[in-house]
A protein has these predicted regions:
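Active-site HxH/HxHxD metal-binding segment of metal-dependent hydrolases
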Residues: 54-60, 73-142
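Zn-dependent metallo-beta-lactamase
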Residues: 1-67, 237, 272
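Catalytic core of the metallo-beta-lactamase
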Residues: 34-39, 143-204, 222, 226
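Active-site environment of divalent metal-dependent phosphoester hydrolases
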Residues: 54, 91-95, 119-121, 140-143, ...
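Metallo-beta-lactamase
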Residues: 2-23, 114-180, 264-298
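Pre-active-site segment of Zn-dependent metallo-hydrolases
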Residues: 14-19, 43-90, 98-102, 160, ...
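Divalent metal-coordination and catalytic microenvironments
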Residues: 38, 48, 89, 96, ...
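Cap/insert and terminal regions of metallo-dependent hydrolase folds
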Residues: 111-113, 117, 189-281
Length: 299
């Protein structure tokens, strides 16, 4: 993988054929929080896009007002094409009606991958018809289109939960695109089986939240995620060559300072084997399927 900086608006970048992914290549762009564009020559995917101010409107005047620290890098109506959206769970910064409904209206064939446990909520939040939703559950391997599958892994959003039918409301996704495997954990903390489940999936890159957790946030309805140390440990234990650290920089009460992440990047570059990247806008991460897995993620 190599990272490429750019200074054009993301919408213009995505619409410019000169920057289209090459055959066998996957290109990632960060949307803020846990959101990413996953671009390939065959299809364009989004995962956990939060591109509105839904939460600022909902929580205005409360202890945690959810005011943005950064603007959305693109508006829903500015995408020139889109084929699939994946939502890891029902929380609004991952399944946002202010983002999903405009996308569903603009792209009438757009489909949505959602946890089966939250299907009813997903129907309300997307505003899409039932046939446009693809409900998934941990342990499945679901074909999405030619050369692309998603394999959900249960996530623990502080707790490893199931509903009355035994279905997991919090999921991570292993997304395979023509030989490139991405693991996006959704919101997650460590639990005993996680490292082995992820290791067996053999991802090339992990997209992991690093905003951590504490009693103040969880006690006020804001369950947390991996610490940076825990995210690094998961990537190492699962033998993942590279990590993009995200879920920071959007809400002031629920973030990690960029200099803390950058210091860990520098330390790992000097003393370790893991390639760590801090999610940031104005950056494209290129992953090529033709390169051997261990070499693929080098700087």
């Amino acid at each position: 993988m190599h990272a490429e900086s750019f200074d054009t608006p993301l919408a213009a970048r995505l619409a410019d054929a000169r920057h289209a992914p090459r055959a066998g290549e996957v290109v990632l762009y960060w949307l803020g929080q846990a959101g990413f564009v996953i671009d390939t020559p065959e299809a364009r995917l989004l995962i956990d896009p939060y591109l509105s101010d839904s939460l600022a409107q909902k929580y205005r005047g409360t202890r945690f007002p959810h005011e943005r620290m950064m603007p959305a890098p693109i508006a829903p109506h500015d995408f020139d094409r889109l084929d699939l959206v994946l939502c890891t769970h029902r929380h609004t910064d991952h399944m946002d009606p202010g983002t999903l409904q405009p996308l569903a209206e603009r792209f009438t064939s757009l489909r949505f991958v959602v946890p089966e446990a939250s299907l009813d909520e997903a129907l309300r939040r997307t505003g899409a018809s039932r046939e446009r939703l693809i409900p998934v559950e941990a342990g499945q391997r679901v074909p999405l289109f030619d050369g692309c599958t998603v394999s959900p892994i249960a996530s623990a959003h502080e707790t490893l939960d199931t509903d009355e039918a035994g279905r997991h409301p919090w999921l991570g996704y292993v997304i395979e695109l023509h030989g490139v495997r991405l693991y996006h954990s959704g919101d997650c903390v460590p639990y005993p089986q996680l490292h082995e489940r992820v290791r067996q999936a053999a991802p090339d890159v992990a997209l992991l939240p690093v905003n951590g957790r504490d009693a103040t946030r969880s006690g006020n309805g804001v369950p947390g995620n991996f610490t940076l140390d825990e995210a690094v440990e998961l990537a190492r234990a699962a033998h993942i060559p590279a990590l993009i650290a995200h879920h920071h920089g959007l809400f002031g009460f629920n973030t990690l300072a960029p200099e803390v992440i950058d210091a860990r990047i520098d330390d790992e570059r000097e003393h370790g084997a893991l390639s760590i990247h801090r999610a940031q806008t104005g950056c494209a991460w290129h992953i090529g399927a033709s390169t051997p897995r261990r070499a693929r993620m080098g700087e």
